[in-house]
């Protein structure tokens, strides 16, 4: 896969990055159901063997567990080090209650915890997970700027921020990248965020390009009904009526386009996100060996103009 430069940074990413959210397991509010840690480690190794050069994680995934698993996978690589992206702001109490914090002291504590769990000396890409509390985003961003100067973080970014919030950060420290949700179903960044990032050389690394699996081509009503009780998608409006019927119909239409192109609906969904010049790389989740091999072709697929026009009609 051809590497792409991430905004103003000196990082060059593969068009697909491995998302590890599901590797946090199901024992927390936003889990994806039970997960085998050994399979998670094998999945990380397989993604790197296939050529992916970066992965995205967060402390809150499994309340620290996901970063521990990633750290285990990195240790077993014996020196072969991918680019690591992780986050701060989503803290939790002893009972598992998630609490947003953007105070200087909490962020300095979080970065030390992440460095320890991951087993690394520096975090390549560090970002505020959510802009909450909003009144503290300047303090939180100033703390991350300190971490960059201290050499504990290479490049600083944010996730789920609006243009208005990005503008508040820029005078403190330049934003190198933004991680927003973006897919055929969720296109909210197209009108304002993408143009702003283009104007300010901010790289975009969208998450959920397959809308949590809804655009994988595998979704049926029975598939949704079979989701584990601890899978947070059971409470996602996109996985429930009245939106589910629309999303299943969208899957059927995309499957027809993908078949004509000799690809899969999942790869088509990923390539559609990557068609945006300002998008550097798409975060694609996997939780067991074989899954990333089913989607990695999306990083190489160039969708013909007639197919893009057909997709536009489907999405209209």
Residue locations for each model-derived region?
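A short acidic, helix-capping loop that chelates divalent metal ions and anchors anionic groups
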Residues: 24-29, 91-97, 215, 291
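Active-site groove signature of glycoside hydrolases
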Residues: 115-133
